């Protein structure tokens, strides 16, 4: 009976987000706005009116696309906060617009796209000149992107 069971594809069950009361959110923190993981860049609260609660006005920048999102919610309501992980990987190659990254476990991942714009150009330039660099990869809500580079410690 136990031979037919296959548990390899299960994940740890960790949620992509966790709830936090609107009034507990802070500037430079993270929040999900319009379904996107955002960094809070501006936050203001309005006073309690005759009817209802104090409102919190949030402005956030999408951590992957850089687009600006806004939302207003009562201060007592819960908002989703994305679980964000930052990992550094050693760059060992670039092929067809994808990065080859060496993980701590010794495995190589080749599923991460070379970022567009200045960061992508800088990564290519440093790789072509033979520099050993670490790529900082940000993951949140099933998305991942290379967001920064730094020289490897010798």
UniProtKB/Swiss-Prot annotation:
State the PROSITE patterns in the record: IF5A_HYPUSINE
Enumerate the GO terms in the molecular function aspect.
Answer: ribosome binding; RNA binding; translation elongation factor activity
Q: Which residues form a coiled coil?
A: none
**Residues with the N-acetylalanine modification:** 2
**Places the protein is found:** Cytoplasm; Nucleus; Endoplasmic reticulum membrane
Q: Does the keyword Protein biosynthesis apply?
A: yes
Got a GO cellular component term for this one? nucleus
Principal location listed in the UniProt entry: cytoplasm
Endoplasmic reticulum as a keyword? yes
Its Gene Ontology biological processes? Answer: positive regulation of translation; positive regulation of translational elongation; positive regulation of translational termination; translational elongation
NCBIfam families xref list: eIF_5A (TIGR00037)
Q: Which family does it belong to?
A: Belongs to the eIF-5A family.
**Subunit relationships:** Binds to 80S ribosomes. Actively translating ribosomes show mutually exclusive binding of eIF5a (EIF5A or EIF5A2) and EEF2/eEF2. Interacts with DAPL1; interaction takes place at the polypeptide exit tunnel of hibernating ribosomes and prevents translation. Interacts with DHPS. Interacts with SDCBP. Interacts with DOHH.
The job of this chain, per UniProt, is described as: Translation factor that promotes translation elongation and termination, particularly upon ribosome stalling at specific amino acid sequence contexts. Binds between the exit (E) and peptidyl (P) site of the ribosome and promotes rescue of stalled ribosome: specifically required for efficient translation of polyproline-containing peptides as well as other motifs that stall the ribosome. Acts as a ribosome quality control (RQC) cofactor by joining the RQC complex to facilitate peptidyl transfer during CAT tailing step.
Please report the name of this protein according to its UniProt entry. Eukaryotic translation initiation factor 5A-1
């Amino acid at each position: 009976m136990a031979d037919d069971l296959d548990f390899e594809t299960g994940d740890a069950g960790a949620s992509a987000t966790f709830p936090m009361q609107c009034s507990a959110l802070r500037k430079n923190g993270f929040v999900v706005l319009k379904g996107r993981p955002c960094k809070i860049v501006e936050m203001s609260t309005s006073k309690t009116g005759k009817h209802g609660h104090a409102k919190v006005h949030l402005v956030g920048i999408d951590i992957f696309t850089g687009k600006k999102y806004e939302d207003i919610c009562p201060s007592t309501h819960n908002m989703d906060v994305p679980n964000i992980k930052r990992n550094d990987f050693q760059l060992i190659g670039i092929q067809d617009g994808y990065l080859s990254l060496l993980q701590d476990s010794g495995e190589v991942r080749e599923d991460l796209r070379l970022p567009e714009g200045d960061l992508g150009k800088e990564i290519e330039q440093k790789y072509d000149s033979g520099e050993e660099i670490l790529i900082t990869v940000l993951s949140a809500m099933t998305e991942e992107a290379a967001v920064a580079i730094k020289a490897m410690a010798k």
